Amino acid sequence: MSEFITVARPYAKAAFDFAVEHQSVERWQDMLAFAAEVTKNEQMAELLSGALAPETLAESFIAVCGEQLDENSQNLIRVMAENGRLNALPDVLEQFIHLRAVSEATAEVDVISAAALSEQQLAKISAAMEKRLSRKVKLNCKIDKSVMAGVIIRAGDMVIDGSVRGRLERLADVLQS
Protein backbone atom coordinates (compact mmCIF):
# COMPACT_ATOMS: atom_id res chain seq x y z
CA MET A 1 0.00 0.00 0.00
CA SER A 2 1.10 3.48 -0.76
CA GLU A 3 2.06 5.95 1.93
CA PHE A 4 -0.57 8.39 0.61
CA ILE A 5 -3.57 6.03 0.93
CA THR A 6 -4.81 7.56 4.20
CA VAL A 7 -4.29 11.06 2.84
CA ALA A 8 -6.07 10.18 -0.42
CA ARG A 9 -9.21 8.68 1.11
CA PRO A 10 -11.01 11.92 2.11
CA TYR A 11 -10.22 13.59 -1.24
CA ALA A 12 -11.48 10.53 -3.12
CA LYS A 13 -14.62 10.36 -0.99
CA ALA A 14 -15.38 14.05 -1.55
CA ALA A 15 -14.77 13.74 -5.30
CA PHE A 16 -16.87 10.57 -5.51
CA ASP A 17 -19.77 12.04 -3.55
CA PHE A 18 -19.71 15.14 -5.76
CA ALA A 19 -19.54 13.01 -8.93
CA VAL A 20 -22.48 10.86 -7.83
CA GLU A 21 -24.53 13.92 -6.90
CA HIS A 22 -23.87 15.46 -10.34
CA GLN A 23 -24.15 12.15 -12.24
CA SER A 24 -20.63 12.46 -13.62
CA VAL A 25 -18.77 9.52 -12.08
CA GLU A 26 -17.25 8.37 -15.39
CA ARG A 27 -16.10 11.89 -16.24
CA TRP A 28 -14.55 12.37 -12.79
CA GLN A 29 -12.71 9.07 -13.02
CA ASP A 30 -11.30 10.12 -16.40
CA MET A 31 -10.22 13.52 -15.04
CA LEU A 32 -8.56 11.95 -12.00
CA ALA A 33 -6.83 9.37 -14.20
CA PHE A 34 -5.42 12.13 -16.40
CA ALA A 35 -4.29 14.21 -13.42
CA ALA A 36 -2.70 11.14 -11.80
CA GLU A 37 -0.72 10.50 -15.00
CA VAL A 38 0.47 14.11 -15.02
CA THR A 39 1.96 13.65 -11.52
CA LYS A 40 4.06 10.76 -12.87
CA ASN A 41 5.78 13.01 -15.43
CA GLU A 42 9.42 13.65 -14.43
CA GLN A 43 9.24 17.43 -14.86
CA MET A 44 5.97 17.64 -12.95
CA ALA A 45 7.39 15.42 -10.19
CA GLU A 46 10.23 17.94 -9.81
CA LEU A 47 7.72 20.79 -9.54
CA LEU A 48 5.67 18.87 -6.97
CA SER A 49 8.71 18.25 -4.79
CA GLY A 50 9.99 21.81 -5.23
CA ALA A 51 9.32 24.93 -3.21
CA LEU A 52 6.70 26.58 -5.41
CA ALA A 53 3.90 28.49 -3.72
CA PRO A 54 0.72 26.37 -3.62
CA GLU A 55 -1.19 28.83 -5.84
CA THR A 56 1.57 28.81 -8.46
CA LEU A 57 1.85 25.03 -8.31
CA ALA A 58 -1.91 24.57 -8.69
CA GLU A 59 -2.12 26.95 -11.66
CA SER A 60 0.89 25.30 -13.34
CA PHE A 61 -0.64 21.87 -12.83
CA ILE A 62 -4.02 23.02 -14.15
CA ALA A 63 -2.33 24.64 -17.17
CA VAL A 64 -0.59 21.35 -18.00
CA CYS A 65 -3.89 19.46 -17.74
CA GLY A 66 -5.63 22.01 -19.94
CA GLU A 67 -9.12 21.09 -21.14
CA GLN A 68 -8.95 17.68 -19.44
CA LEU A 69 -10.13 19.20 -16.15
CA ASP A 70 -13.42 20.97 -15.58
CA GLU A 71 -13.88 23.83 -13.10
CA ASN A 72 -14.82 21.53 -10.21
CA SER A 73 -11.85 19.21 -10.65
CA GLN A 74 -9.61 22.28 -10.91
CA ASN A 75 -10.94 23.30 -7.49
CA LEU A 76 -9.96 19.88 -6.13
CA ILE A 77 -6.45 20.39 -7.56
CA ARG A 78 -6.23 23.81 -5.89
CA VAL A 79 -7.29 22.42 -2.50
CA MET A 80 -4.83 19.53 -2.77
CA ALA A 81 -2.04 21.94 -3.78
CA GLU A 82 -2.81 24.22 -0.81
CA ASN A 83 -2.43 21.20 1.46
CA GLY A 84 0.69 19.92 -0.31
CA ARG A 85 -1.07 16.74 -1.42
CA LEU A 86 -0.85 16.70 -5.23
CA ASN A 87 1.55 13.74 -5.00
CA ALA A 88 -1.38 11.73 -3.64
CA LEU A 89 -3.41 12.01 -6.88
CA PRO A 90 -2.64 8.43 -8.05
CA ASP A 91 -3.94 7.16 -4.70
CA VAL A 92 -6.98 9.44 -4.92
CA LEU A 93 -7.73 7.80 -8.27
CA GLU A 94 -7.26 4.32 -6.78
CA GLN A 95 -9.61 5.11 -3.89
CA PHE A 96 -12.14 6.71 -6.27
CA ILE A 97 -12.16 3.54 -8.41
CA HIS A 98 -12.64 1.45 -5.27
CA LEU A 99 -15.57 3.60 -4.11
CA ARG A 100 -17.12 3.32 -7.57
CA ALA A 101 -16.73 -0.46 -7.61
CA VAL A 102 -18.33 -0.77 -4.18
CA SER A 103 -21.15 1.56 -5.21
CA GLU A 104 -21.81 -0.31 -8.44
CA ALA A 105 -21.24 -3.74 -6.84
CA THR A 106 -18.57 -4.53 -9.40
CA ALA A 107 -15.10 -6.00 -9.18
CA GLU A 108 -12.08 -5.41 -11.40
CA VAL A 109 -10.63 -8.74 -12.53
CA ASP A 110 -7.26 -8.95 -14.29
CA VAL A 111 -6.94 -11.81 -16.76
CA ILE A 112 -3.38 -12.44 -17.94
CA SER A 113 -2.77 -14.90 -20.76
CA ALA A 114 -0.05 -15.74 -23.28
CA ALA A 115 -2.38 -15.03 -26.22
CA ALA A 116 -5.64 -13.19 -26.80
CA LEU A 117 -8.67 -15.07 -25.46
CA SER A 118 -11.83 -15.65 -27.49
CA GLU A 119 -15.12 -13.99 -26.59
CA GLN A 120 -16.43 -17.39 -25.50
CA GLN A 121 -13.48 -17.94 -23.13
CA LEU A 122 -13.88 -14.44 -21.69
CA ALA A 123 -17.60 -15.02 -21.18
CA LYS A 124 -16.87 -18.26 -19.26
CA ILE A 125 -14.28 -16.54 -17.08
CA SER A 126 -16.62 -13.61 -16.46
CA ALA A 127 -19.53 -15.89 -15.49
CA ALA A 128 -17.35 -17.99 -13.18
CA MET A 129 -15.87 -14.92 -11.46
CA GLU A 130 -19.29 -13.27 -11.07
CA LYS A 131 -20.53 -16.43 -9.37
CA ARG A 132 -17.45 -16.71 -7.15
CA LEU A 133 -17.38 -13.03 -6.14
CA SER A 134 -21.17 -12.54 -6.03
CA ARG A 135 -20.94 -9.33 -8.03
CA LYS A 136 -20.59 -8.05 -11.57
CA VAL A 137 -17.04 -8.15 -12.91
CA LYS A 138 -15.11 -6.02 -15.35
CA LEU A 139 -12.37 -8.00 -17.08
CA ASN A 140 -9.04 -6.29 -17.76
CA CYS A 141 -7.26 -8.53 -20.27
CA LYS A 142 -3.49 -8.44 -20.63
CA ILE A 143 -1.17 -10.51 -22.78
CA ASP A 144 2.09 -11.70 -21.22
CA LYS A 145 4.16 -14.20 -23.21
CA SER A 146 5.95 -15.36 -20.04
CA VAL A 147 2.70 -17.05 -18.93
CA MET A 148 3.44 -19.64 -21.69
CA ALA A 149 -0.09 -21.11 -21.70
CA GLY A 150 -3.18 -20.94 -19.50
CA VAL A 151 -4.30 -17.88 -17.57
CA ILE A 152 -3.65 -16.00 -14.36
CA ILE A 153 -6.73 -14.35 -12.83
CA ARG A 154 -6.45 -11.65 -10.16
CA ALA A 155 -9.33 -10.07 -8.29
CA GLY A 156 -8.23 -8.01 -5.30
CA ASP A 157 -6.22 -10.31 -3.03
CA MET A 158 -7.36 -13.47 -4.80
CA VAL A 159 -5.06 -15.00 -7.43
CA ILE A 160 -5.91 -18.04 -9.52
CA ASP A 161 -2.78 -19.19 -11.31
CA GLY A 162 -3.69 -21.64 -14.05
CA SER A 163 -0.61 -20.87 -16.12
CA VAL A 164 2.01 -23.34 -17.26
CA ARG A 165 4.66 -21.06 -15.76
CA GLY A 166 2.90 -21.21 -12.37
CA ARG A 167 2.62 -24.98 -12.53
CA LEU A 168 6.31 -25.31 -13.40
CA GLU A 169 7.25 -23.03 -10.49
CA ARG A 170 5.12 -25.08 -8.08
CA LEU A 171 6.65 -28.31 -9.41
CA ALA A 172 10.16 -26.88 -8.93
CA ASP A 173 9.28 -25.94 -5.33
CA VAL A 174 8.03 -29.47 -4.62
CA LEU A 175 11.13 -31.04 -6.14
CA GLN A 176 13.45 -28.79 -4.13
CA SER A 177 11.79 -29.49 -0.78
Curated annotation (Swiss-Prot):
<keyword id="KW-1003">Cell membrane</keyword>
<dbReference type="InterPro" id="IPR020781">
    <property type="entry name" value="ATPase_OSCP/d_CS"/>
</dbReference>
<comment type="similarity">
    <text>Belongs to the ATPase delta chain family.</text>
</comment>
<keyword id="KW-0406">Ion transport</keyword>
<comment type="subunit">
    <text>F-type ATPases have 2 components, F(1) - the catalytic core - and F(0) - the membrane proton channel. F(1) has five subunits: alpha(3), beta(3), gamma(1), delta(1), epsilon(1). F(0) has three main subunits: a(1), b(2) and c(10-14). The alpha and beta chains form an alternating ring which encloses part of the gamma chain. F(1) is attached to F(0) by a central stalk formed by the gamma and epsilon chains, while a peripheral stalk is formed by the delta and b chains.</text>
</comment>
<dbReference type="GO" id="GO:0045259">
    <property type="term" value="C:proton-transporting ATP synthase complex"/>
</dbReference>
<dbReference type="InterPro" id="IPR000711">
    <property type="entry name" value="ATPase_OSCP/dsu"/>
</dbReference>
<keyword id="KW-0997">Cell inner membrane</keyword>
<keyword id="KW-0139">CF(1)</keyword>
<dbReference type="Pfam" id="PF00213">
    <property type="entry name" value="OSCP"/>
</dbReference>
<comment type="function">
    <text>F(1)F(0) ATP synthase produces ATP from ADP in the presence of a proton or sodium gradient. F-type ATPases consist of two structural domains, F(1) containing the extramembraneous catalytic core and F(0) containing the membrane proton channel, linked together by a central stalk and a peripheral stalk. During catalysis, ATP synthesis in the catalytic domain of F(1) is coupled via a rotary mechanism of the central stalk subunits to proton translocation.</text>
</comment>
<protein>
    <recommendedName>
        <fullName>ATP synthase subunit delta</fullName>
    </recommendedName>
</protein>
<dbReference type="GO" id="GO:0046933">
    <property type="term" value="F:proton-transporting ATP synthase activity, rotational mechanism"/>
</dbReference>
<keyword id="KW-0813">Transport</keyword>
<keyword id="KW-0472">Membrane</keyword>
<dbReference type="InterPro" id="IPR026015">
    <property type="entry name" value="ATP_synth_OSCP/delta_N_sf"/>
</dbReference>
<keyword id="KW-0375">Hydrogen ion transport</keyword>
<comment type="function">
    <text>This protein is part of the stalk that links CF(0) to CF(1). It either transmits conformational changes from CF(0) to CF(1) or is implicated in proton conduction.</text>
</comment>
<keyword id="KW-0066">ATP synthesis</keyword>
<dbReference type="GO" id="GO:0005886">
    <property type="term" value="C:plasma membrane"/>
</dbReference>
